C-alpha cells in the first residue's frame, strides 16, 4: 500500500515557543507528537544537546514523526503511548523530571483527512475513530451495542448535542434492521433525525455526534485529567507546560486544573483565618487562553478553534 501523505500544520507555533521558552540542553516532552511540527521547533531551540521525548497513541503518526525528526538522531526518543502514561514511559527512560511539556489535543489533520480512520463524515469509511487502532472499541461497536439512554448521555455530555435523545432513538430503530458500520450511514442518520438536518449549513448536523463518539471511544477527557495531573508532577521547578485544546470541554478542564493549582487558601469559606497554609504550585503564563492570529487562521482554518494555555511550576 502506498504511504499516505501526512499533512499537518502545527498550530500557534510562535506562541508555543514563547510559552515554553526552550533553552539549549533542556529536556522536553511532546505528549502528542503527531507529525513532529512542534517537536522540531523545540529540538531546534534546545540544540545542540537538548532532548525531546515524543509520545503518541497513533502508531502512524509516530512513524511519520520518526521520519520527520530523523535528522535529530539520538536527541529525540519516540514512544507509543498515551500522554497520561508519561510517568511510566519516562521512568523506563530513566528520566525523572523535565523542563517542559507540550500537549496538543484533538485530532490531527492527517487523521481527519485519512478516510479509513473514520474520524470524518466527509467521505464514506469504516466507523472506527480510534487513535490507537490496536486496542479498544470502535465507534461502530459503540453505536451498535450501547443502550439509547447511554448513547444520548454520550452525545449530550461530550458533544453538547441538543437533539441527543432523538438521535439515539433513531440509532436504536435503524440498527434493529442492520448495524451502522460506516461514517456515511451515521452522518445521514443524524441528518434525517434532527430538525432542519437537510437545510444547507456551514456546520454539518453530525459534527457534534462525531465529536462525542471520538471523545468516548478514546476516553479523551479522562486521559486529559490524568495527563494534566501527572504532567505537572514531572515538571522541574521553573518548568513550563503548554496545552492546546480545540473545544470547550477540553479547554474547561485545562482552565479549571490550572486555576486549582494557582489557588492559595482552600479552607472552608466560614473560617475567619486561613488554616491550610496552602501555597500555589504554579504560576499562570496565560491569564486568558491565547487564540490563533487571523493570518494563521486564514492559512490554516483548523486553528480557529485552538486555545493555548500555559503554566510555570513554582
UniProtKB/Swiss-Prot annotation:
It is an enzyme of class 2 (transferase). Its EC number is 2.1.1.199. Coiled coil: none annotated. It comes from the Bacteria. Keywords: Cytoplasm, Methyltransferase, rRNA processing, S-adenosyl-L-methionine, Transferase. S-adenosyl-L-methionine binds at residues 36-38, 56, 83, 104, 111. It is found in: Cytoplasm. One of its GO terms (cellular component) is cytoplasm. GO terms for biological process: rRNA base methylation. InterPro entries: RsmH, SAM-dep_MeTrfase_MraW_recog, SAM-dependent_MTases_sf. It catalyses: cytidine(1402) in 16S rRNA + S-adenosyl-L-methionine = N(4)-methylcytidine(1402) in 16S rRNA + S-adenosyl-L-homocysteine + H(+). GO terms for molecular function: rRNA (cytosine-N4-)-methyltransferase activity. Specifically methylates the N4 position of cytidine in position 1402 (C1402) of 16S rRNA. Belongs to the methyltransferase superfamily. RsmH family. NCBIfam families: 16S rRNA (cytosine(1402)-N(4))-methyltransferase RsmH (TIGR00006). This is Ribosomal RNA small subunit methyltransferase H. It comes from Syntrophotalea carbinolica (strain DSM 2380 / NBRC 103641 / GraBd1). The gene is rsmH.
